[in-house]
């Protein structure tokens, strides 16, 4: 049976990562968290106080402490920078609020996209992000673009933060998500947009299981036809 490449794109908190992880597990595919890679680069910038004028220093740190993924005992994914476990650190609000400017840096995107394509070559992979279907994997056999209302996405982020023990204000989250949408869709390099051949799916009011079922059925149909 042929293993395909699946690209899932969409704005912040549209359910991309949650859905991608479940589908990867169900299909026996590899899940590559591209967002965690950009968050890791952002974490480096913030930890060292680097600005957008010091891209070379961020890249140098990425080379010294490469991003890697490992599995925890419970099956969840751990993110490492070198030997440092940054799984929780990269989900903090300061990283979330700064990831747009770091991910917009052409040199950072070029390096991380190169790594992502190399990993995806063999197929049997599912990636989520903001430019997977348009830039990273334009040859993906299945491209999905998830959308949802700002209200619903803020609610999801609020619940996620509670589960992780991170304090947050609901109204502030709404403002931050709306601001992130604007930044991501208006940046010069790889702006957030659906690929021309992507299936657009509004997840507002749809359960995670419903989204998973929709995407998985599409994937299985493509595999059966190939």
Curated annotation (Swiss-Prot):
Top-level taxon in the UniProt lineage: Bacteria
Entry binding sites for ATP: 10-18
SUPFAM superfamilies noted in UniProt: P-loop containing nucleoside triphosphate hydrolases
Location within or outside the cell: Cytoplasm
Main location: cytoplasm
Coiled coil: none
InterPro entries: Cytidylate_kin, Cytidylate_kinase_dom, P-loop_NTPase
GO cellular component terms given for this protein: cytosol
GO biological-process terms attached to the record: nucleobase-containing small molecule interconversion; pyrimidine nucleotide metabolic process
Record flagged with keyword Chloroplast: no
Keywords assigned by UniProt, alphabetized: ATP-binding, Cytoplasm, Kinase, Nucleotide-binding, Transferase
Pfam families hit by this protein: Cytidylate_kin
Family: Belongs to the cytidylate kinase family. Type 1 subfamily.
Protein name (database record): Cytidylate kinase
Gene symbol of the encoding locus: cmk
């Amino acid at each position: 049976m042929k293993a395909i490449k699946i690209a899932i794109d969409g704005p912040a908190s549209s359910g991309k990562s949650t859905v991608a992880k479940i589908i990867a597990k169900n299909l026996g595919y590899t899940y590559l968290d591209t967002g965690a890679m950009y968050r890791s680069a952002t974490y480096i910038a913030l930890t060292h106080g680097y600005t957008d004028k010091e891209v070379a220093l961020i890249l140098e740190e990425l080379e010294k402490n490469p991003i890697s993924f490992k599995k925890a005992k419970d099956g969840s994914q751990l993110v490492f920078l070198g030997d440092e476990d940054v799984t929780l650190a990269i989900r903090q609000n300061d990283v979330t609020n700064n990831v747009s400017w770091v991910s917009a840096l052409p040199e950072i995107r070029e390096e991380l996209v190169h790594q992502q394509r190399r990993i995806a070559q063999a197929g049997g992979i599912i990636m989520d992000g903001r430019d997977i279907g348009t830039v990273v994997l334009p040859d993906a056999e299945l491209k999905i673009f998830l959308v949802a209302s700002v209200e619903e996405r803020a609610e999801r982020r609020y619940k996620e933060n509670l589960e992780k023990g991170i304090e947050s204000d609901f109204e502030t989250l709404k403002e931050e998500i709306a601001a992130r949408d604007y930044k991501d869709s208006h940046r010069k390099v790889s702006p957030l947009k659906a690929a021309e051949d992507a299936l657009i799916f509004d997840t507002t009011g749809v359960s995670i299981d419903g989204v998973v079922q929709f995407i998985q059925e599409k994937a299985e149909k493509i595999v059966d036809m190939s």
